[in-house]
């Protein structure tokens, strides 16, 4: 834990770039009001904490933001995006704000190094989505939106990661959590994050986070986090085990 704290403190003080995430999805359920996020990355140095508190934030009943690719720690662009959402900005308005007001000192406050996925529910309860992928984020990179979700990734093996995550999310019936877990399974193959190809896994760390509309910000319905795993151990398999245990599946 001390070594993780030292790493995070060093990154914060020096303003070094840190590629913290590769593939993620953020989504809303306009029927239930649930909002959730899931993602994974082939990073080292994050330890048991993983990336869940670095790249995603959710306002229960309102919306959520994933901020990834090259980020500062703490993730000031994520914090600013959430503040804009709290002030009433739509996902597309938040993207516009972030592009004009990049607050990460790494790479000279250049939004071309960033990647975002944003979803919310408007005043009528209808879903809205937006995304952004900067030209200087690592290839393969893409963000893709549906009516109630945004899936995004960078430093991916290829487009298949995004294709599979989108297809699994759309084809899965059940709760928002079920759909997010299925989306993650779509990226469960060697090299989904290309840095993990040699280890035969998709990533080194993964998470799943879901809020009901009436949850307190510090008390989500579901928070599953798989911290950094050794080479050869598949985090999405472990995430599935945690999810099955949460549901009581044998």
What is the meaning of each model-derived region?
Residues 20-250:
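N-terminal nucleophile
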């Amino acid at each position: 834990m001390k070594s993780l704290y030292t790493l995070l403190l060093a990154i914060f003080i020096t303003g070094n770039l840190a590629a913290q995430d590769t593939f993620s999805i953020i989504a809303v359920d306009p029927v239930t009001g649930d909002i959730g996020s899931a993602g994974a990355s082939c990073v080292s140095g994050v330890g048991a904490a993983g990336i869940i508190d670095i790249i995603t934030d959710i306002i229960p009943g309102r919306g959520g933001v994933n901020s990834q690719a090259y980020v500062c720690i703490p993730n000031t662009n994520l914090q600013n995006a959430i503040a804009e959402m709290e002030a009433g900005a739509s996902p597309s308005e938040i993207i516009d704000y972030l592009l004009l007001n990049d607050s990460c000192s790494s790479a000279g406050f250049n939004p071309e190094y960033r990647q975002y996925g944003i979803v919310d529910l408007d005043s009528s309860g209808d879903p809205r989505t937006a995304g952004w992928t900067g030209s200087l984020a690592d290839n393969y990179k893409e963000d893709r939106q549906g009516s109630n979700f945004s899936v995004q990734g960078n430093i991916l093996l290829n487009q298949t990661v995004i294709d599979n995550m989108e297809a699994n999310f759309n084809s899965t019936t059940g709760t928002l959590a079920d759909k997010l877990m299925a989306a993650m399974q779509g990226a469960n193959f060697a090299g989904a994050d290309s840095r993990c190809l040699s280890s035969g896994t998709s990533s080194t760390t993964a998470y799943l986070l879901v809020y009901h509309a009436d949850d307190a910000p510090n008390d989500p319905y579901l928070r599953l986090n798989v911290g950094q795993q050794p080479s050869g151990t598949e985090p999405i398999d472990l995430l599935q085990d945690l999810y099955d245990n949460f549901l009581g599946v044998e």
